């Protein structure tokens, strides 16, 4: 009776079922994680392009080898349909017992979603128009012990998505696309900066003093020197030292660490790109910012008109420069300047839900109004200029 209960527990637990399959493979002398490199002939996206004109119901004698993760399985008697996913896309595997033989067919029937396999076969398109590989042999490359997120509900919990990105990447194609675009964007940044005469450098992440921004740092102890060190909160100070040393143009793409709040738009660890150029001014840096962003967009998009969150963003042409007071005035429906009485700015701030501190000056109040009601009105790329001195600690005066 106890043995029957144990078997029932295993059947009810998908992880235990998979572990039992792995143990069965090991008992048969088979390696559930492959024992040699698998040489694939194509990525799936290449097959989609090469056989785009293949007619419905047409078979070929073109042999291919592909590798990927099993994302779906459908058994219909002596035929099994798999959906295989690699880093570039998905394709159907058409598996017939006559082509595979009974033993291999039984092994394929025992595969689980999430298993990694390599498959060899001939290209074809089903009568229903599905591009497929008619499999004649396969190899288990890695047995998955954990089931994928449920097919129809997917992975929607933001907390899990952020903490387990590898799972998010498996089931959400748009996330994988974002990762790939990010890589292309960083490469475009580097190409543009290097073409413009900038040297890419690496500055220390562990620093003996905190500086370069007003943020709380992560603190660690350096045992060898018996001293407190800080994870950098900005790359600024060391980049400026390189200019002091004689470099004219430098930039760094690097990780920044700030021990502060965390939400979907703020991460304690993030990447920044910071650049410095000798003999330059605001106009020159505006030109740099516009150029590098347009270059990054060109690397991942075919147009300079982008659809984002229901709005069309136009990054073409020269980007406008608008004073902060002008943006705030437009949002308020009345003109405000740095000469506007503080008492009136306080009234406007409170009216817009801003908690005002007694020490705030006109410049600080305008900056707060900009953050609250001005910035949300900006859609296209815009250089906001003439920041108040109170919120511009590093600006020339």
Where are these regions (language model features)?
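Class II aminoacyl-tRNA synthetase catalytic cores and aaRS-like
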Residues: 1-397
């Amino acid at each position: 009776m106890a043995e029957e209960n144990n078997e029932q527990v295993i059947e009810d637990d998908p992880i235990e079922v998979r572990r039992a399959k792995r143990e069965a493979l090991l008992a048969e002398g088979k390696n559930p994680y492959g024992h040699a490199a698998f040489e694939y002939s194509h990525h799936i996206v290449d097959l989609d392009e090469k056989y785009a004109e293949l007619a419905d119901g047409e078979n070929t004698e073109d042999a291919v080898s592909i590798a990927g993760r099993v994302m779906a399985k459908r058994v219909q008697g002596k035929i099994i349909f798999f959906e295989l996913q690699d880093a570039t896309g998905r394709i159907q595997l058409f598996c017939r017992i006559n082509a595979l033989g009974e033993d291999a067919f039984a092994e394929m029937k025992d595969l689980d979603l999430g298993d990694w396999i390599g498959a060899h076969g001939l290209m074809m398109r089903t009568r229903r128009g599905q591009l497929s590989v008619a499999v004649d042999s396969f190899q288990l490359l890695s047995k998955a012990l954990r089931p994928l997120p449920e097919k129809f509900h997917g992975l929607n919990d933001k907390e899990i998505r952020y903490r387990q990105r590898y799972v998010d990447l498996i089931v959400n194609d748009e996330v994988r696309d974002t990762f790939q675009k990010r890589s292309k964007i960083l490469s475009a940044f580097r190409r543009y900066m290097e073409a413009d005469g900038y040297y890419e450098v690496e500055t220390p992440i562990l620093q003996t003093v905190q500086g370069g921004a007003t943020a709380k740092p992560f603190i660690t102890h350096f045992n060898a020197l018996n001293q407190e060190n800080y994870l950098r909160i900005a790359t600024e100070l060391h980049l400026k030292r390189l200019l002091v040393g004689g470099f004219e143009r430098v930039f760094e793409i690097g990780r920044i660490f700030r021990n502060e709040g965390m939400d979907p738009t703020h991460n304690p660890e993030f990447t920044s790109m910071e650049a410095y150029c000798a003999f330059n001014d605001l106009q020159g840096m505006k030109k740099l910012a516009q150029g590098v962003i347009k270059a990054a967009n060109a690397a991942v998009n075919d147009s300079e008109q982008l659809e984002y969150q229901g709005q069309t963003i136009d990054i073409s042409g020269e980007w406008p420069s608008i004073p902060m007071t002008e943006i705030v005035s437009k949002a308020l429906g009345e003109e405000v300047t740095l000469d506007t009485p503080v008492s009136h700015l306080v009234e406007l701030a409170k009216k817009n839900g801003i908690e005002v501190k007694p020490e705030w000056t006109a410049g600080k109040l305008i900056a707060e109004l900009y953050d609250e009601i001005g910035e949300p009105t900006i859609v296209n790329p815009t250089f906001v200029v003439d920041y108040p001195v109170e919120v511009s600690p590093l600006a020339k005066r």
